[in-house]
Structure formats: structure tokens, C-alpha cells
Amino acid sequence: MGQNDLVKTLRMNYLFDFYQSLLTNKQRNYLELFYLEDYSLSEIADTFNVSRQAVYDNIRRTGDLVEDYEKKLELYQKFEQRREIYDEMKQHLSNPEQIQRYIQQLEDLE
């Protein structure tokens, strides 16, 4: 698995965490098996007694769907921004003025 594949898988895992409640059971099952459980398309197809192509199409469409949710709702983006701010805050605990600026940045995200 290449670096880009790992980055995509990690992103999809986060998007799945944020948006899984908006998906159908079938969409949830396919994404969970493919990205979280690392099943192959063939294994998923065998599990659900469908074609490999049907699984691929469903995973691709569902991936596009959660990306669209992210584009509109930005839950993952805001999560990443908050995490960066928290990391920076930890580096500046002895500087109250800087901590106050970080708190303001966090409030602005909400």
C-alpha cells in the first residue's frame, strides 16, 4: 500500500466516523469492511453474494457521498484545525497571552 493509499484510507476512516450515521446499513457495512477491516472487494462480494463490480461501485459512490458531506459540513476539517490548535497550546502553556489567542481561535471554529 502506497503513501497516498494510506492517507486516503486514514481520511476515509475519519470521514466514516463523522458521517456513518447518515449512511444506509449497506453503505456502512461496505465502507467498514473495506476501510476499517481491510477486506478486499472480492471478500466483501462473497460476504454479500454480489459482484465485485457492485461492491466497487458502491464503495466509490459512498466515498464520494461522505466527501460531499464533508465539503458541506466540514466536521473533519474543523476537527483537524482544533487538533492543531491543541497541539500548539501544549507548546505554549507558560504564555497566557498566546493561550488566550488559541482559545479565541477555537471559539471562532464553532
Curated annotation (Swiss-Prot):
Xref: Pfam families: UPF0122
HAMAP family (alphabetical): UPF0122 (MF_00245)
Function of the protein: Might take part in the signal recognition particle (SRP) pathway. This is inferred from the conservation of its genetic proximity to ftsY/ffh. May be a regulatory protein.
Family per record: Belongs to the UPF0122 family.
Protein name: UPF0122 protein SAV1236
Organism: Staphylococcus aureus (strain Mu50 / ATCC 700699)
